[in-house]
Amino acid sequence: MHPVLRQMRPPPQQRQEQEQRQTCRAPSPSPTASGGATSAADAAADGDYEPPRRRARHYLDLEEGEGLARLGAPSPERHPRVQLKRDTREAYVPRQNLFRDREGEEPEEMRDRKFHAGRELRHGLNRERLLREEDFEPDARTGISPARAHVAAADLVTAYEQTVNQEINFQKSFNNHVRTLVAREEVAIGLMHLWDFVSALEQNPNSKPLMAQLFLIVQHSRDNEAFRDALLNIVEPEGRWLLDLINILQSIVVQERSLSLADKVAAINYSMLSLGKFYARKIYHTPYVPIDKEVKIEGFYMRMALKVLTLSDDLGVYRNERIHKAVSVSRRRELSDRELMHSLQRALAGTGSGDREAESYFDAGADLRWAPSRRALEAAGAGPGLAVAPARAGNVGGVEEYDEDDEYEPEDGEY
């Protein structure tokens, strides 16, 4: 109800008194009425009966208010917010990713151990087990209750499964992005130009034109500082990894033209996996690398590969090709008043011409029709002293039409 109308209503106490008086004056039921009507009349006589309209109005008043206005609800189940929460509730399981959550807080190699432990416990865990009170009593030998051990194992299995699902989604998203970018022709052209540019910059790092072009290219990558810094220092040792990545992507996308789209996506994934393993072993100086660190390095190279392909797409659209597109008349810009008056002035100035010229004046390019000079007509064979050659068949107006290949000689005084 509108707040203004709500203010015009009588106070609740006065409304209750009016409704009680109306209830007391209610007519007695007929003897032929059903038992339900008789019981309702008896309840009204005792003062416990509440008419349906009054109950509906009471619930309506409760739903209109907020906060304390809802304290008069008959039961918690009738509370609007409780009903909304019950209708929208869902089983909440907190998201976990053993590879990426709580960065810098886990002990070294603990993520790897949790991941492998969850994978091993997944087959022997009883998912239908119901914990009872005796399960929470600690064991005399280990000091750990069976319930605590079961909950810990269930947490490890849940974390393992959620980690696997999130990594699967990350890999699918990467494949879809790579497939979409590699399928574009602009990406291949832009990657070819980018590779050619970085190769020239590597051979001549002190070239000022190349450095100026490098700053222009960097303007397309503003959202990732690591990629931006590596691109600015691509000729330095700390940017060598980006140069290797561009070379690998160029060899797959540009050089191998016979590969299908799926093969190119697979080759890029294999390259990211190989680069991740190589640099992970180079960091840890050992063939054994924790799986979480290896996955993080692979994810870094995947993001950088997407940055290179996106940058190639931005560079590939800068092609000096003239685009021929038919634009409908309705999409052209209309003439301004000044342009319209100028066209009208030219139209009025050419009113004395022939009828055909007047009819075709507003055709495309009709007002820009070129008429040859007198000397050009004489040189074409009209004879000396004749200003206008005999009209050709179908030429009205006394001016002979010539092709664009005809020679043009300026008159005396023309330049």
UniProtKB/Swiss-Prot annotation:
The record marks T351, G352 as: Cleavage. One of its GO terms (cellular component) is host cell nucleus. Residues 31-46, 381-394 have a biased composition (Low complexity). The modification Phosphoserine is found at S75, S360. Residues 1-56, 66-85, 381-415 are annotated as: Disordered. Induction: Expressed in the early phase and late phase of the viral replicative cycle. Keywords: Host nucleus, Late protein, Phosphoprotein, Viral genome packaging, Viral release from host cell. Cleaved at different sites by the viral protease during virion maturation. Its main location: host cell. Belongs to the adenoviridae packaging protein 3 family. Part of the genome packaging complex composed of packaging proteins 1, 2 and 3; this complex specifically binds to the packaging sequence on the left end of viral genomic DNA and performs packaging of the viral genome. Interacts with hexon-linking protein IIIa; this interaction is required to promote correct genome packaging. This is Packaging protein 3.
